[in-house]
C-alpha cells in the first residue's frame, strides 16, 4: 500500500515512497486445455442413411468408421440408424453379387498372430484384394483389447490403401461384441472389402463366435507349443479348415516341418466335414514370407470347392439363422438388466444371495416373475 495515497498498486512507479515498479500488463488469451476445448465442441450431426450409404459404397473409410461407431453404440437413436444402414448394406451386397471371403483366425499364445496377419494381409492386398481386419475380444472393455496394440504393430497394413483395421468394439459380454463384429463385417463388405479377417484374441471362448461368422477357420500353431497336440483343445482343431505352423524360419524350420506332419495326421482322424473339404496343415514364416502363397492358394481352393457344391451359400444361411436367435437372446437380456425396476431389485436380491438368505435359483425365479408382471 502506498504510504502517501493509500492506493494499491501505486499509480506511478516513480513514487518515492515505494521501491516497487509496476509494469503495464500485457493482455493474454485465456488458458484452455485443448482436450477440454475439443470435448465441449459441438458434436457433428448424424448423416442421413443415404449419405452413410453413399460414403460406404464409394469406399470412404472415414464414413465407414463413423457408421461402425453407430453400430457399436448402445444409444437407442444410434441403433435405429445403424439397423437401417446394416439392412441397406446387406441389400447392396446381395445386388452386387459379390461373394466375399470371411476368414476367422485364432492361435495359441506366442504364435505371432498379429505378425502373421500383417505379413499375410499385405500379401493378399498385393494380389489385388481389399482386406478388412476385425477382432472379437470380450475383454476389450477392461484391457482395451490386444488389437489396439496390434494396430500399432501392423504399420504396413495401416498404411495400405487396400486395407482397413478396426479395433474390437468395447462391450462387456462376448455376445455383444460378437454381434457388433458381425454387423461390422456386413458394412465392410458393402464398402468393397472382399476379404475379411476376423481375429480372436487368444484361444478361448471366442473361437465359437468367430467360427459362427466365418467361411474359413485358420488356426495358427507353434512347433512344440504345449507339447504339440496336447496344447490345443480338440474342439478348436475340429473347427479348423487349416492349421498353419508359424515361425518356420532359421533354426526352427525342421521343428516346424515335423509339427506340420503331426498336425496333418491328427486332422485326418476327425470325421469328414460337411463341406467335403479335407483340412490341411502348412508351415509359414512372416519373416521370409515362405508359405504365404501356399496358404492363400489353399484358401482359394477351399472357396472354389464350397461355392461349387453349394456349401458356401447354405452355411451363410445357417449363420444368419443362428445370429437371429443370438440377437433375440441379447435383446431379451438387455431388456431385463436395463429395466429400472429390476436394476433396483437386483441389488437387494444379490445381497440376500450373498448373505445366504436366499438360494440363487429362487432369487432368479422371483426376479423373472417380477419382470414378467411389470406390464400387468
For each feature predicted by the language model, list its residue ranges.
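Long, well-ordered amphipathic alpha-helical subdomains in the mid-to-C-terminal portions
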Residues: 64-65, 283, 294-372
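Short beta-strand/turn micro-motifs at beta-sheet edges
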Residues: 152-153, 229-234, 269-273
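Alpha-helical scaffold elements adjacent to nucleotide-binding pockets in ATP/GTP-utilizing enzyme cores
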Residues: 147, 184, 209, 213, ...
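Non-catalytic terminal/linker segments enriched in charged/polar, low-complexity residues
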Residues: 1-95, 99, 343, 364, ...
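Canonical P-loop GTPase G-domain recognition
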Residues: 242, 248-305
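Flexible active-site lid/hinge loop adjacent to a nucleotide/diphosphate
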Residues: 225-254
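Nucleotide-state-sensitive switch-loop elements of NTP-binding domains
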Residues: 48-111, 115, 120-206, 213-220, ...
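Short hinge/gating elements
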Residues: 49-53, 106, 111, 168, ...
